[in-house]
Regions:
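Short acidic-hydrophobic, aromatic-tinged amphipathic segments that line or gate anion-handling sites
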Residues: 165-181
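Generic detector of well-ordered alpha-helical segments enriched in charged/polar residues
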Residues: 154, 176-179, 183, 198
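The feature marks cytosolic C-terminal regulatory regions of anion transporters and related permeases
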Residues: 1-165, 183
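Intrinsically disordered or compositionally simple regulatory linkers and C-terminal tails
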Residues: 186-202
C-alpha cells in the first residue's frame, strides 16, 4: 500500500502533466511526453536508495527487528540484514556500497552476512551481476554471504544459473536456518555464546 507521501507525489506528477498537456495544446503529445518523463524520474528517485537495515532481536525473542531503531545489540561475527525493494541497475551500486560499509564497520570480526531477501520482488541482470561479483569479493576477504527467504526472486536466480554457480548451501528458507549453518561452519562456541543471537542458534 502506497504511503500518503507517495500518493501526494503521484498527484503532483499527474496534475503537472495535465496542466502541461493543456498548455502545449494543440501539441498535446509534448505534455504527455513530459508527464511520462516526470513519472520515470520519480520512480528512479524513489527506488535508488531502498531501505537497508541490520536486524537483531531482544534477548529470548524470535522476532527480528531493525537493530538501530530499537537500540538492539548487534552480532559482530554474523550479521543479518534486510533489503526492501527491487534490485536493478539504478540501485545495485547502493546495495553493494551498504554491504561493503557493513564489512568495513565491523573490521575483521565479521565472517558471515545473512541477507533477508523477502523484501526483494524483482532483480535484473545488473542486480544479479552485482551480487555475483560481491560474493566473490567478500569470499576473498574472508566474509561469506548467505541468503534467506528468497521466494520473490528464487525462480529467476535458478533459471539464470546463479544458484548453481555459487552453491545451493548459500540459500535458506528461514533466517534461523542460515544462522545455524553459519555458526556450525565457524565452529566457534565461545563467540556464539557471546552473540546477542545465541538463543536462535541452538
Amino acid at each position: 500500500m502506497a504511503s500518503s507521501f507517495e500518493r501526494i507525489e503521484r498527484a503532483i506528477v499527474a496534475v503537472t502533466a495535465f496542466v502541461l498537456t493543456i498548455l502545449f495544446a494543440p501539441h498535446l503529445e509534448n505534455g504527455i511526453v513530459i508527464g511520462v518523463i516526470l513519472s520515470l524520474g520519480l520512480f528512479l528517485f524513489r527506488t535508488m536508495e531502498p531501505r537497508f537495515t541490520e536486524l537483531s532481536t531482544h534477548d529470548g525473542s524470535t522476532m527480528f527487528m531493525n537493530a538501530l531503531d530499537n537500540d538492539l545489540n548487534r552480532c559482530e561475527v554474523v550479521s543479518i540484514v534486510k533489503y526492501s525493494g527491487s534490485l536493478y541497475f539504478a540501485n545495485a551500486g547502493y546495495f553493494e556500497d551498504r554491504m561493503l560499509k557493513l564489512i568495513a564497520d565491523k573490521h575483521h570480526c565479521l565472517k558471515y552476512i545473512i541477507v533477508d531477501m523477502a523484501g526483494i520482488n524483482q532483480i535484473d541482470a545488473s542486480g544479479e551481476e552485482m551480487l555475483s561479483g560481491l560474493l566473490d569479493r567478500c569470499s576473498a576477504a574472508g566474509v561469506e554471504i548467505l541468503f534467506a527467504r528468497m521466494e520473490g526472486i528464487e525462480k529467476v536466480l535458478i533459471r539464470s544459473g546463479f544458484s548453481d554457480k555459487h552453491g545451493k548451501d548459500r540459500f535458506y528458507e528461514r533466517r534461523t536456518d542460515a544462522l545455524r549453518y553459519a555458526w556450525k561452519e565457524l565452529g566457534d562456541e565461545e563467540a556464539a555464546s557471546k552473540s546477542p543471537l545465541k538463543h536462535l542458534i541452538s
